[in-house]
Amino acid sequence: MTVPQYIGPNRTGITVIIIGLGIGGLTAAISCHLQGHHVIGFDKLENLEPYGDGLILTPNGSQVLRDLDDTGAIAAWINTWAYNCRDCKIYNTDGVHVGQHPIPDTDKGLSLLPRGGLVQILYQTAKRLGLDLRLGVKINEFVEDVDQARVIIDGVHVQGDCIIFADGANSRGREAVSSCNVKPYYSGFSVYRGRADGAALIKDPQCHWLLSKEGAIDQATGFAGPEMYVQLATCGGGQASFCIGITQRFALQHTQSAENFWTTPIDKNEMLDKISYWKCINQIRPVIDKMAKDQFILCPLLRAGVLDSWVSPIGRIAVIGDAAHPFFPTSAQGAAQAIEDAATLAITLALAGKNNIRLGLKAMEAMRKHRATYIQRNAWRVNDAWFGSPVEERIGEKAAPAIGVIDWITEHCCRTYASNEFDRVQDSIATGQPYVPTNIPSQQFKEAAEWIANRNDEKEKN
């Protein structure tokens, strides 16, 4: 199999407008540019500050990013965060070891890296390539017709061939493409997220159980409580430490909206107070205390029913990433699946051509929808099963709410797949015959198809 070669800028005559310049949006912008499309990108933030904690990036996502930059800068940066931890040891609230979660693919390109740092290097790469990216612009109005798509900013029309919404679960693009499930809902779960500089942990002997001067091998430790799962991990050979604390039965009481939680830090004691009765609190507290004040946040975890389409009826608006399929952090696939969407989109648009934008967008959806839906829903299922289980059963392989590394997910090359499958998808769309993707095993495809078919039965859980 061969990965399609990039053909250089401005060869296709297609102008792609991208709304949202996070990981998915920036990957789409660079991929589209390299496939020959003209790109105009917008983000409401005035500066793409390095907010956020860490994210797992598996090879199905990282290889796409490595190939976006011919200077090797992205690949070199990802390599500095290569993950060499082999397992995550899990303890109960008494500090008793109850199981461990294997991390088997650390030698195949698995990385644990800072989310904000990844956004920064992608943005720098896009600017070096000369992409037209406009920050501090909130898009409130957009239109499409059979000939073009436009965004309207202070009365000024910016015209393109299509609009791609990559602006998260609360995207306005959802209502432009789907007749159902356009509003995400609070899942009943939230996650505390934080980041600490590795040097701060090394200076404190109370943190040496997680990271010391000899910490070239990364560590990951989980603590399983009745209503919260806390995971602390180091990465980059001790460059940084990350925290996630997934909690249920949590009433949203904060003033920050679901749209700005990434940039609204909270008091770390809020999380610590919730686990103050744990016997292992004195082990956890020193590490949490080292988390940067402006990098410790509380994220409501949103769910959304399956959209009946990722593409508008006219065929010039599409959603990708969390705008199409919001993920839980326990999936370890949110970033990688957004990257797969983005890279696939760039290729299918190039293969469809300027005169058939709708085909390009619908082909992307056909290739991606079942795969992304299954990975998303399976992570929700594992999360719910864990939190719904008796505490005494959270041992061994069930000690953590994690799905693990699955080969058919992590070893997939979405670019080769998009290139090889396009003709078959095009024929399916032309004839109306169902397209059965091969980037997902048959049993998982059947489950995803059932979820998609029953999308109108999904109700918000209160």
Swiss-Prot record:
Keyword Glycoprotein: yes
Cellular component GO terms held in the UniProt record: membrane
Entry binding sites for FAD: 43, 115, 322, 335
Keyword annotations of the record: FAD, Flavoprotein, Glycoprotein, Membrane, Monooxygenase, Oxidoreductase, Transmembrane, Transmembrane helix
Active site annotation, chain numbering: 193
Cofactors named for this entry: FAD
Disruption phenotype: Abolishes the production of both oxepinamide F and oxepinamide E and leads to the accumulation of protuboxepin A.
Glycosylation: residue positions: 10, 60
Subcellular location per the Swiss-Prot or TrEMBL entry: Membrane
GO biological process: biosynthetic process
InterPro entries, per database record: FAD-bd, FAD-dep_Monooxygenase_BioMet, FAD/NAD-bd_sf
Protein name in the entry: FAD-dependent monooxygenase opaC
Gene (name only): opaC
Function: FAD-dependent monooxygenase; part of the gene cluster that mediates the biosynthesis of oxepinamides, derivatives of anthranilyl-containing tripeptides that share an oxepin ring and a fused pyrimidinone moiety. The nonribosomal peptide synthetase (NRPS) opaA assembles the quinazolinone core with D-Phe incorporation. The first adenylation domain (A1) of opaA loads and activates anthranilic acid whereas the second A domain (A2) is for activating of L-Phe, which is then converted to D-form by the E domain.
One Pfam family, short name: FAD_binding_3
Residues spanning the signal sequence: none
Protein topology in the membrane: Single-pass membrane protein
GO MF entry, a single one: monooxygenase activity
Entry EC number(s): 1.-.-.-
Transmembrane intervals: 14-34
Pathway: Secondary metabolite biosynthesis
Family: Belongs to the paxM FAD-dependent monooxygenase family.
Source domain of life: Eukaryota
UniProt cross-references to PANTHER family, sorted A to Z: MONOOXYGENASE (PTHR13789), MONOOXYGENASE, PUTATIVE (AFU_ORTHOLOGUE AFUA_6G12060)-RELATED (PTHR13789:SF236)
